[in-house]
Regions:
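Feature captures the catalytic cores and cofactor-binding loops of soluble hydro-lyases/lyases
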Residues: 11-23, 28-135
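Short, Lys/Arg-enriched N-terminal segments with co-localized hydrophobic residues
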Residues: 2-9
């Protein structure tokens, strides 16, 4: 919940649906693009890209908030493998989703939304994604 004029209210952000579904969890945010192929360990869900803001942190069960993906198209299948291994994020929110993340979210059935002002979401926030709506709880 966010404090607005002395009251606590839920804030809702509307975005574009990339992958339908519902996900809820703690936000894990970065201002850097993410490469799932080679940047995230598909067996543990830990970001392994050297120098990345999230290096050493697990995305498992988190609402992963990042500007966009980057890297190889194999990243889509890395997301799928993460889902099968039980270490995928509970949902993803992008400023601008690109093909690799979109395909990975869809085939893995991970809720994903883009066209959202991701600067409003901070690591540790409780977040719910339901289709095109992002709710900060």
């Amino acid at each position: 919940m966010r404090e607005r004029g002395g009251d606590w209210k839920m804030e809702q952000l509307r975005g574009r649906i990339i992958s339908r579904g519902k996900g809820e969890g703690e936000a894990l945010t970065t201002t850097q693009p993410i490469s799932f192929y080679g940047g995230v360990d598909p067996n543990t869900g830990i970001v392994i890209e050297k120098g990345h803001q999230l290096q050493g942190i697990s995305v498992k069960g988190k609402i992963l908030v990042f500007p966009q993906g980057k890297g190889s198209t194999v990243g889509s299948y890395t997301l799928y493998r993460m889902k099968k291994n039980g270490v995928a994020p509970a949902g993803m929110i992008n400023r601008e989703c690109e093909t690799v993340v979109a395909v990975g979210a869809i085939i893995s059935e991970i809720p994903c939304v883009d066209k959202v002002d991701i600067s409003k979401i901070k690591s540790g926030d409780r977040v719910k994604i339901e289709n095109g709506t992002v709710t900060l709880l």
